[in-house]
Amino acid sequence: MGLSPAASGEFGIRLSRVPWPRPTQISKTSSTESSDTQSATGQSTVPHSDSASSQALLVQFLPKQLKQDRRLEQARSFQQGEKPETSLELTPSKKRTELIPTSNSEIESTQKNQAVEGNPRPRPGDLIEIFRIGYEHWAIYVEDDCVVHLAPPSEFEAGSITSIFSNRAVVKYSRLEDVLHGCSWKINNKLDGTYLPLPVDKIMQRTKNMINKIVQYSLIEGNCEHFVNDLRYGVPRSQQVEHALVEGAKAAGAVLSAVVDSIRPKPITA
């Protein structure tokens, strides 16, 4: 008689984990008497293997309370010196625990793999767009997970929106993760279709020559996007500012149109 798939569901118990009671030895006299009695009454004898099989089938449908009783019996047998039955099969929680990296090398390797899966690994000269709250910060990738970017002179202002209103900036060589401040990022060489990038060695030379220099900063004419585009293409350009100016012009035009409409004399109706 086969078991349905539901038997191995919530109320199923793996038989390998349940310590079955040891069969007691029956004397030959009692065995003979029982066989004679069964023969006299006309009942057939049931082999022990069939009884154990029936018991195994019933165990599949035992409620949770009986499961707990089985576990208590297993604990008592362990305390009495009996060797508990162990299963070599790993549970999902054990599998997850074993996959967690423990050593520093494993952690660093995992982080690098996750970074590669989330974003392609940058190459020297690639532009990095960092999505901060309210604006996008830009940097240029150099080597060994390090970038060069414009930053305010005060470290307290780094990563803050107030940094975009400063009139000075310092060119810094920093680790990418230190520049992110928990923000997301991506490689964005979007002007490659408009301008031909300079040779990589020239980009790197120009970039390294700017490190630690203090430069004039202007949100409209010389921000971080102007800076990295100038290093890669030789053209200081910021599409972020261009889009803002276009949207501002549209908004100003809409306001002006509304004002003109409001002051325009209306025709008198009879």
Curated annotation (Swiss-Prot):
Ranges for region Disordered: 1-54, 70-122
Gene Ontology CC annotations of this record: cytosol
Keyword DNA damage among record annotations: no
Residues the record marks as active site: H137, H149, C224
One Gene Ontology term of the molecular function aspect: phospholipase A2 activity
Localization, UniProt: Cytoplasm, Cytosol
Listed EC numbers: 2.3.1.-, 3.1.1.32, 3.1.1.4
GO BP, sorted A to Z: N-acylphosphatidylethanolamine metabolic process
Tissue: Isoform 4 shows highest expression level in testis.
Main location: cytoplasm
Catalytic activity: a 1,2-diacyl-sn-glycero-3-phosphocholine + H2O = a 1-acyl-sn-glycero-3-phosphocholine + a fatty acid + H(+); a 1,2-diacyl-sn-glycero-3-phosphocholine + H2O = a 2-acyl-sn-glycero-3-phosphocholine + a fatty acid + H(+); 1-hexadecanoyl-2-(5Z,8Z,11Z,14Z-eicosatetraenoyl)-sn-glycero-3-phosphocholine + 1,2-di-(9Z-octadecenoyl)-sn-glycero-3-phosphoethanolamine = N-(5Z,8Z,11Z,14Z-eicosatetraenoyl)-1,2-di-(9Z-octadecenoyl)-sn-glycero-3-phosphoethanolamine + 1-hexadecanoyl-sn-glycero-3-phosphocholine + H(+); 1,2-di-(9Z-octadecenoyl)-sn-glycero-3-phosphoethanolamine + 1,2-dihexadecanoyl-sn-glycero-3-phosphocholine = N-hexadecanoyl-1,2-di-(9Z-octadecenoyl)-sn-glycero-3-phosphoethanolamine + 1-hexadecanoyl-sn-glycero-3-phosphocholine + H(+)
Domain of life, per lineage: Eukaryota
LRAT domain sequence ranges: 127-240
Function: Exhibits both phospholipase A1/2 and acyltransferase activities. Shows phospholipase A1 (PLA1) and A2 (PLA2) activity, catalyzing the calcium-independent release of fatty acids from the sn-1 or sn-2 position of glycerophospholipids. Shows N-acyltransferase activity, catalyzing the calcium-independent transfer of a fatty acyl group at the sn-1 position of phosphatidylcholine (PC) and other glycerophospholipids to the primary amine of phosphatidylethanolamine (PE), forming N-acylphosphatidylethanolamine (NAPE), which serves as precursor for N-acylethanolamines (NAEs).
Protein name: Phospholipase A and acyltransferase 5
Taxonomic lineage: Eukaryota, Metazoa, Chordata, Craniata, Vertebrata
